[in-house]
């Protein structure tokens, strides 16, 4: 029985070490003036100076959700996931997405597949109000079986509006936005457990929710201290807001049925579930005490399922009611 993400083939700790090895080789890749990097602690997007603002850049893919979507004949929405994984990261630094490019690698040309991917990419860009300005298609049968999909998003933010987590404070309220399902993380483990139930399958391949328009509306109404996109690593993403504080989640959003089923099916420990999956929590927003009522009003008007899930406190780490 597979009980952890590592046993399914994805070792998060090993992945972090491998990424660190790559980053260690990147010294001397900066320039002065426009294009000069703006330092961010564990930022969700890379930032470089441009005039009186900054370009924000993200790149990401969909991962093994592609395989489940293929099995369930749901490839027409997988492009939404690709856009979402990038633009949801961009808005965490306060940047508005401007343009997106995709990369498709194939083992052979497939016009039906490409049309399905294109439909999803177009819908994702419409939801994010983002121009799809280009892309690359590579037929590489020696490297790829079936296909892979990734993309890059670029946004812009005024220098004074960059959200870098430096204003997070003890007592800030944490607002949670509901996810639409597992989004695009944990699918190597999910595929080991899935039993081909069509109802569950529909929940598992639901496209990643795009929070761009809701968060942009919020940024225009409330002073937002930090945002965290809850993706791979689960709750640990909260520490990317500002690791000098403790994040207390004592009023979590309801856990969707799909996650309960996965936990029972795989006999997975709660700590592993919350490290691998979003558990119904797609985005977390930190605002000052006193601003939470207005923030909730704006978010709910924008169509989000949102609630106060906890607070920022003195200390370090993450505390979640389900793990106590």
PLM ranges: what are they?
Residues 61-74, 102, 196-200, 267:
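Glycine/charged-rich beta-loop-alpha catalytic/anionic-binding loops adjacent to active sites
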Residues 49, 53, 62-63, 81-82, ...:
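Glycine-rich anion-binding loops of enzyme active sites
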Residues 1-91, 129, 133, 169, ...:
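N-terminal glycine-rich phosphate/pyrophosphate-binding loops that anchor nucleotide-derived ligands
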Residues 2-7, 24, 113-131, 142-147, ...:
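Glycine-/charge-enriched secondary-structure boundary and capping motifs
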Residues 88-100, 272:
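Short, flexible active-site-proximal loops enriched in glycine and acidic residues
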Residues 52-57, 61-63, 191, 253-263:
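Acidic-glycine-rich active-site phosphate/pyrophosphate-binding loop
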